């Protein structure tokens, strides 16, 4: 842990952005944060100022991403079918299996230096899940966890009806995180039929829109989620920038 912790966070809303472009950007922030941490070691302890943190909100055009522990066969369509669906495909460096991102899904990439908070990846994941659960409660949706599975679920205590509403997958090095979560607000859920989501073949997926049978404001979801992340991690929000 840093002696002088820094819980400031710069929030950036990138809007709809190409997956590769967002991946490159968060990688840049991730690497820069690690470099700043390493540079601190050469300074006297009382002069060390911990690097700040970043939180990216965005949506992506249709894309499937496969994590390091995933299986290529969990993508159930061919290259030609991918092109017909106007969807991209990437094999990436986060944990987890395959998932889908698309318009109407809120993607969050926290680039947090956990030395500013707590050095426990499992606790970090549970905090992210809790922020999602509290956000869904703001829309009168009851959500929870399933033991042994990362993410957030509706009717999590009913194996026959449990359905996933938020997927998660992260990478961490020197306690700096990247990648994050994908909350289904109102995406086209038919795209999930082309994969075995997160490598789990016996659970359905859902969205806020499907659960409520009505559309909701993406901005409202972001606002609630930021409120809960701020409270859980005791963040100090520097400012929020929007890219259109």
Curated annotation (Swiss-Prot):
UniProt protein name: Octanoyltransferase
Molecular-function annotations in GO: lipoyl(octanoyl) transferase activity
PROSITE patterns linked to this entry: BPL_LPL_CATALYTIC, LIPB
Subcellular location: Cytoplasm
GO biological process, one term: protein modification process
Main location: cytoplasm
One cellular component term from this protein's GO annotations in UniProt: cytoplasm
UniProt keyword annotation of Chaperone present: no
Domain (BPL/LPL catalytic): residue spans on this chain: 49-237
Record site feature (Lowers pKa of active site Cys), residues: 164
Pathway, per record: Protein modification; protein lipoylation via endogenous pathway; protein N(6)-(lipoyl)lysine from octanoyl-[acyl-carrier-protein]: step 1/2
Family statement: Belongs to the LipB family.
Enzyme Commission (EC) number: 2.3.1.181
Domain of life the protein comes from: Bacteria
CDD domains: LipB (cd16444)
Binding-site positions, substrate: 94-101, 167-169, 180-182
Keywords on record: Acyltransferase, Cytoplasm, Transferase
Reactions that this protein is recorded to catalyse: octanoyl-[ACP] + L-lysyl-[protein] = N(6)-octanoyl-L-lysyl-[protein] + holo-[ACP] + H(+)
Gene3D superfamilies assigned: Bira Bifunctional Protein, Domain 2 (3.30.930.10)
Protein purpose: Catalyzes the transfer of endogenously produced octanoic acid from octanoyl-acyl-carrier-protein onto the lipoyl domains of lipoate-dependent enzymes. Lipoyl-ACP can also act as a substrate although octanoyl-ACP is likely to be the physiological substrate.
Miscellaneous: In the reaction, the free carboxyl group of octanoic acid is attached via an amide linkage to the epsilon-amino group of a specific lysine residue of lipoyl domains of lipoate-dependent enzymes.
Active-site annotation: 198 (acyl-thioester intermediate)
